[in-house]
């Protein structure tokens, strides 16, 4: 029986038999074992300092920060994501095992924030790179708001159906060098598909704007150039 879906369950009744399904048992076991990968790029990430402290103590939710994406099933993105950092974020997400979840924390992560107004190098929303499960607005969000987002994610976990999760594998977005994003199935290798990478056209196919100029120069003979210079000398002497 799921403790989040049925919070009024009396656990003190002796000699009781609780019947459940394998799906609910799997969801219940994952509720208190979320291992986050903290991906912070700017000021919103400083709120984790107070969140880890004794006042809020997010360890009581079973959150154990991991430094390796292969050991994490939750990634919290905080701060501005630039085009230069986008491939690293996608690669970290690809290396996380299924099932995996994303919490977008802060206005800069969700929409690009004030840096995306006239910036050509800022990603306007991390959901253009990876699928987001919970959006957490704020500049920056308070630690209480982060705990509320984790609670909402736990409620989402408790309602998941294993058949749906296994039947429809979560599709991932692949970043290419020409800033185009494709929906691809997960490869878990961290390497880019060479078929999606931008291939520069051959030099012979590039139209040259200076080609008529060189054709004109090649058609002018050295004798004509000598005659032109002689005319210029005569005109200067006459003056």
Curated annotation (Swiss-Prot):
Give the gene that encodes this protein.
ndhK
Quaternary structure and partners: NDH is composed of at least 16 different subunits, 5 of which are encoded in the nucleus.
State what this protein does: NDH shuttles electrons from NAD(P)H:plastoquinone, via FMN and iron-sulfur (Fe-S) centers, to quinones in the photosynthetic chain and possibly in a chloroplast respiratory chain. The immediate electron acceptor for the enzyme in this species is believed to be plastoquinone. Couples the redox reaction to proton translocation, and thus conserves the redox energy in a proton gradient.
Cofactor(s) this protein requires: [4Fe-4S] cluster
- Biological-process GO terms, alphabetical: aerobic respiration; electron transport coupled proton transport; photosynthesis, light reaction
Q: Where is the composition biased (Basic and acidic residues)?
A: 225-239
The UniProt similarity line reads:
Belongs to the complex I 20 kDa subunit family.
- What HAMAP family does the record tag this protein with? NDH1_NuoB
Q: Where does [4Fe-4S] cluster bind?
A: 43-44, 108, 139
Reaction catalyzed: a plastoquinone + NADH + (n+1) H(+)(in) = a plastoquinol + NAD(+) + n H(+)(out); a plastoquinone + NADPH + (n+1) H(+)(in) = a plastoquinol + NADP(+) + n H(+)(out)
Entry note: cofactor: Binds 1 [4Fe-4S] cluster.
In which organism is this protein found? Answer: Acorus calamus var. americanus (American sweet flag)
**Organism superkingdom:** Eukaryota
Q: Which GO terms describe its molecular function?
A: 4 iron, 4 sulfur cluster binding; iron ion binding; NADH dehydrogenase (ubiquinone) activity; quinone binding
- What is the name attached to this protein's record? NAD(P)H-quinone oxidoreductase subunit K, chloroplastic
Q: Where is this region: Disordered?
A: 217-239
Which key words tag this protein in UniProt?
4Fe-4S, Chloroplast, Iron, Iron-sulfur, Membrane, Metal-binding, NAD, NADP, Plastid, Plastoquinone, Quinone, Thylakoid, Translocase, Transport
Q: Does the keyword Cell inner membrane apply?
A: no
Record SUPFAM superfamilies? HydA/Nqo6-like
Instruction: State any GO CC term.
Output: respiratory chain complex I
**Matches recorded under InterPro entries:** NADH_UbQ_OxRdtase-like_20kDa, NADH_UQ_OxRdtase_20Kd_su
One protein family per Pfam: Oxidored_q6
According to its record, how does it sit in the membrane? Peripheral membrane protein
Enzyme Commission identifier(s): 7.1.1.-
Q: Where in the cell is it found?
A: Plastid, Chloroplast thylakoid membrane
């Amino acid at each position: 029986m799921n403790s989040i879906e049925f919070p009024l369950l009396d656990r003190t009744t002796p000699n009781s038999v609780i019947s459940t399904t394998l799906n609910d048992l799997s969801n219940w076991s994952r509720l208190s074992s979320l291992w986050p990968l903290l991906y912070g790029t700017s000021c919103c990430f400083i709120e984790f300092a107070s969140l880890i402290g004794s006042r809020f103590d997010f360890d009581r939710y079973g959150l154990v920060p991991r430094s390796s994406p292969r050991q994490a099933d939750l990634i919290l993105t905080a701060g501005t994501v630039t085009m230069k950092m986008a491939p690293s974020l996608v690669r970290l997400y690809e290396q996380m095992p299924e099932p995996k979840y994303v919490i977008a924390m802060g206005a800069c992560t969700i929409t690009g924030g004030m840096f995306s107004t006239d910036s050509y190098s800022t990603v306007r929303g991390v959901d253009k790179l990876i699928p987001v499960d919970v959006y957490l607005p704020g500049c920056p969000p308070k630690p209480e708001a982060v705990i509320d987002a984790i609670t909402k994610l736990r409620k989402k976990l408790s309602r998941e159906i294993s058949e749906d999760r296994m039947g429809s594998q979560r599709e991932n977005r692949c970043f290419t060098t020409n800033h185009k994003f494709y929906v691809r199935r997960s490869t878990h290798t961290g390497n880019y598909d060479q078929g999606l990478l931008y291939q520069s056209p051959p030099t012979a196919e590039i139209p040259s704007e200076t080609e008529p100029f060189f054709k004109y120069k090649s058609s002018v003979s050295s004798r004509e150039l000598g005659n032109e210079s002689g005319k210029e000398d005569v005109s200067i002497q006459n003056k």
